[in-house]
């Protein structure tokens, strides 16, 4: 289930005061928390009353609106209560094409079952020691 959430910015306005420092107030663009919660609960309780009478239970299948912003308003209040709640978005399902099977590729693998299995051309430069001896280097080219 997916939904869209838009939170309008809070406006800070200075209030006139007799004190030299101005006071700021928060103006929320929507109704108060109490009125918004009562409307959400009344919508929710009418749709889920047949299922349960527990106010902490939410019926996710009975409403066309996403309930997550409403729950956020109840839990954290503040900015969450000023959110616009939009209808749930249903994503279109697209058929997935099966990947084309690639042809098997022949590869040449080195045998790594001996402690001296190295690339002979690079062995003397990288490892030195016995890998620089003529007996080991004779098959390098």
UniProtKB/Swiss-Prot annotation:
Would the keyword Thylakoid be found if you checked this record's keyword annotation? yes
User: Null phenotype?
Assistant: Slight increase in nonphotochemical quenching (NPQ). Marked decrease in the accumulation of LFNR1 and LFNR2-containing thylakoid protein complexes.
- For region Disordered, the annotated ranges are 35-58
Task: Please provide the Gene Ontology terms (biological process) for this protein.
Answer: circadian rhythm
Low complexity composition-biased segments: 35-51
Keyword Plastid included in the entry's annotation: yes
What induces or represses its expression, per the UniProt entry? Expression is controlled by light and by a circadian clock. Differentially regulated at the level of mRNA stability at different times of day, being a target of the degradation pathway mediated by the downstream (DST) instability determinant and thus following a circadian clock rhythm with highest levels in early afternoon. Rapidly degraded upon illumination; this degradation coincides with the release of the LFNR from the thylakoid membrane.
Signal peptide coordinates: none
Q: How is it modified after translation?
A: May form interchain disulfide bonds with LFNR1 and LFNR2.
Give the stretch annotated as transit peptide in the record, renumbered to this chain: 1-41
**Where is this chain's protein located in or outside the cell?**
Plastid, Chloroplast thylakoid membrane; Plastid, Chloroplast envelope; Plastid, Chloroplast stroma
The source's superkingdom equals Eukaryota
- List cellular component terms (GO): chloroplast; chloroplast envelope; chloroplast stroma; chloroplast thylakoid membrane protein complex; cytosol
Chain segments carrying region 2 X 15 AA approximate repeats: 58-132
Q: How does it sit in the membrane?
A: Peripheral membrane protein
Q: Where are the sequence repeats?
A: 67-81, 118-132
* Keywords of this entry: Chloroplast, Disulfide bond, Membrane, Plastid, Repeat, Thylakoid, Transit peptide
Q: How does it assemble?
A: Component of high molecular weight thylakoid LFNRs-containing protein complexes containing LIR1, LFNR1, LFNR2, TIC62 and TROL proteins. Interacts directly with LFNR1 and LFNR2; LIR1 increases the affinity of LFNR1 and LFNR2 for TIC62 and subsequent thylakoid relocalization.
Stated role: Thylakoid-determinant subunit of high molecular weight LFNRs-containing protein complexes.
**What is this protein identified as?**
Light-regulated protein 1, chloroplastic
- Report the source organism: Arabidopsis thaliana (Mouse-ear cress)
Lineage summary? Eukaryota, Viridiplantae, Streptophyta, Embryophyta, Tracheophyta
**The gene coding this protein:** LIR1
């Amino acid at each position: 289930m997916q939904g869209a959430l838009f939170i309008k910015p809070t406006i800070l306005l200075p209030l006139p005061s007799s004190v030299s420092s101005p006071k700021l107030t928060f103006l929320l663009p929507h109704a108060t928390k109490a009125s918004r919660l009562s409307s959400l609960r009344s919508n929710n309780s009418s749709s889920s009353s047949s299922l349960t009478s527990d106010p902490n239970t939410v019926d996710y299948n009975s409403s066309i609106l996403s309930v997550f912003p409403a729950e956020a308003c109840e839990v954290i209040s503040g900015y969450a209560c000023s959110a616009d709640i939009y209808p749930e978005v249903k994503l279109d399902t697209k058929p997935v094409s099966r990947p084309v099977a690639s042809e098997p590729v022949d590869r040449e693998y080195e045998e790594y079952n001996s402690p001296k299995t190295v690339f002979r051309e690079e062995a003397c430069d990288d490892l030195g020691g016995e890998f620089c001896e003529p007996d080991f280097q004779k098959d390098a080219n």
